[in-house]
């Protein structure tokens, strides 16, 4: 099983929106398939992929799990769309996926973060510059966000900084390489991208 999780997968790329391209895994016949499952998802976990790119930049995407039992998270998707819920099953199609969990953060805090995200971070406008105008010390919910900033803000609002070394714009790669987060599960060679 280990080899399946870390091996590279065949994939095809399709355009979503004006600039973004999404990679989906395929079988040997070119048919879309899914990774088997996520192990032990918990509220507050972060799922991210680096299988999304725009104009040559592999920026990726991230979501925060708000109801692990039902497989639901909250995400900011793209310009022109409001942040909304997502199903974890939609993340199974990507060839490069990681599940992250904050180090030294108890279940009670992660549950509070999930509840905060569910109640406060849906319906926000999307902004590529999410976080710049509100800053890293914002005390109120931002009006606009992007995927990694939404994840970061959910934790930050509850007293935890999951990307303390990131710059003004928090990216999925900042989350992936954050010393404050541990890897729970990976699909593909995401750590080599």
Question: Where are the regions that the model predicts?
Answer:
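N-terminal accessory segments that precede or flank the first globular/catalytic domain
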Residues: 1-75
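Glycine-rich catalytic cores of cysteine/serine-nucleophile enzymes that process amide/ester linkages
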Residues: 41-104, 131-142
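Boundary regions of SH3-family modules and the immediately adjacent low-complexity/disordered segments
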Residues: 75, 80-82, 86, 108, ...
């Amino acid at each position: 099983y280990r080899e399946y999780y870390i091996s590279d997968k065949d994939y095809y790329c399709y355009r979503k929106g004006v600039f973004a391209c999404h990679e989906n895994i395929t079988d040997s016949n070119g048919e879309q398939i899914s990774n088997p499952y996520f192990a032990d998802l918990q509220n507050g976990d972060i799922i991210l992929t680096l299988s999304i790119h725009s104009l040559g930049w592999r920026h990726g995407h991230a979501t925060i799990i708000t109801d692990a039992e039902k497989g639901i998270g909250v995400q900011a998707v793209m310009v022109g769309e409001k942040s909304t819920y997502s199903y974890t099953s939609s993340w199974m199609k990507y060839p490069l996926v990681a599940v992250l969990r904050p180090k030294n953060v108890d279940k009670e805090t992660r549950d509070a973060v999930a509840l905060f995200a569910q109640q406060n971070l849906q319906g926000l406008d999307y902004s590529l510059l999410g976080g710049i105008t509100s800053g890293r010390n914002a005390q109120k919910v931002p009006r606009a966000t992007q995927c990694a900033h939404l994840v970061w803000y959910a934790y930050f609002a509850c007293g935890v900084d999951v990307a303390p070394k990131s710059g003004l714009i928090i990216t999925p790669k900042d989350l992936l390489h954050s010393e404050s987060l541990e890897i729970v599960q990976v699909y593909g060679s995401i750590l080599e991208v």
